[in-house]
């Protein structure tokens, strides 16, 4: 149980692929102009990570070490192709919006990295959980960044959600404030870099605060004569 909890915490926070490892920067910065686009690509990446980790882990005993990377890439490409066709069939608006960034999931360092670092060494169930956790961690970061940029740039939230979730999702669109022209700095790549930098700073502050609280808790449990050694 502790190993399962550790996998989840690592994927969502401690080893977050977007905020700690800083992997997948190209789609993170390019696609997160709206919350809907960010959520769509994040969920697609999560599905790819989960399925590829599961498949690679299940086949790890029969995968020759010398050619494992080409095999991993072939498996990842197959899963990405299937996910791309699913998005094309059921969320065509999102498919058009994301464009080339869906097939580019094949080259995403997050996917190949988890296959090599985790799925090739652990069982299928734990590997699938790792892929899901890493994917949801990246999705969360992309969604927060996309929401920030959409609100500041357009004054809306969940604009175009019907392209991802269907016609019913039109009710999710919220106009926070009206603007006749978008704030381009937030919508263009420089705004993505600024937003990501702010998110990294906030995560650092939270981590430092949590670390300080843990140190204070340990110091409180020790005898008074030993606190100076903590």
Swiss-Prot record:
Keywords: Cell inner membrane, Cell membrane, Electron transport, Membrane, Translocase, Transmembrane, Transmembrane helix, Transport. It is an enzyme of class 7 (translocase). The chain crosses the membrane at residues 18-38, 39-59, 63-83, 86-106, 125-145, 182-202. It comes from the Bacteria. It is found in: Cell inner membrane. The keyword Cell membrane applies. Its EC number is 7.-.-.-. GO terms for biological process: electron transport chain. GO terms for cellular component: plasma membrane. It is a multi-pass membrane protein. The complex is composed of six subunits: RnfA, RnfB, RnfC, RnfD, RnfE and RnfG. Part of a membrane-bound complex that couples electron transfer with translocation of ions across the membrane. Belongs to the NqrDE/RnfAE family. This is Ion-translocating oxidoreductase complex subunit E. It comes from Citrobacter koseri (strain ATCC BAA-895 / CDC 4225-83 / SGSC4696). The gene is rnfE.
């Amino acid at each position: 149980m502790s190993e399962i909890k550790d996998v989840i915490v690592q994927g969502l926070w401690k080893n977050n692929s977007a905020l700690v490892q800083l992997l997948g920067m190209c789609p993170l910065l390019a696609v997160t102009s709206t919350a809907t686009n960010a959520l769509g690509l994040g969920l697609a990446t999560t599905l790819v990570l989960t399925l590829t980790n599961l498949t690679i882990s299940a086949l790890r005993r029969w995968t020759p070490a010398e050619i494992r990377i080409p095999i991993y890439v072939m498996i990842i490409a197959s899963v990405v192709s299937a996910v791309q066709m699913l998005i094309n069939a059921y969320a065509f608006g999102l498919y058009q919006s994301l464009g080339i960034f869906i097939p580019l999931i094949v080259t995403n360092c997050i996917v190949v990295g988890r296959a090599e670092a985790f799925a090739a060494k652990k069982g299928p169930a734990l590997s699938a959980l790792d892929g899901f956790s890493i994917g949801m961690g990246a999705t969360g970061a992309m969604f927060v960044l996309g929401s920030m940029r959409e609100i500041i740039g357009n004054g809306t939230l969940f604009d175009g959600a019907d392209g991802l979730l269907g016609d019913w999702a039109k009710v999710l669109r919220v106009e926070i404030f009206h603007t006749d022209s978008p704030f381009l700095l937030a919508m263009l790549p420089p705004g993505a870099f600024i937003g990501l930098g702010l998110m990294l700073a906030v995560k650092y502050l939270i981590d430092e605060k949590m670390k300080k609280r843990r140190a204070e808790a340990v110091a409180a449990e020790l005898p008074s004569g030993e606190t100076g050694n903590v």
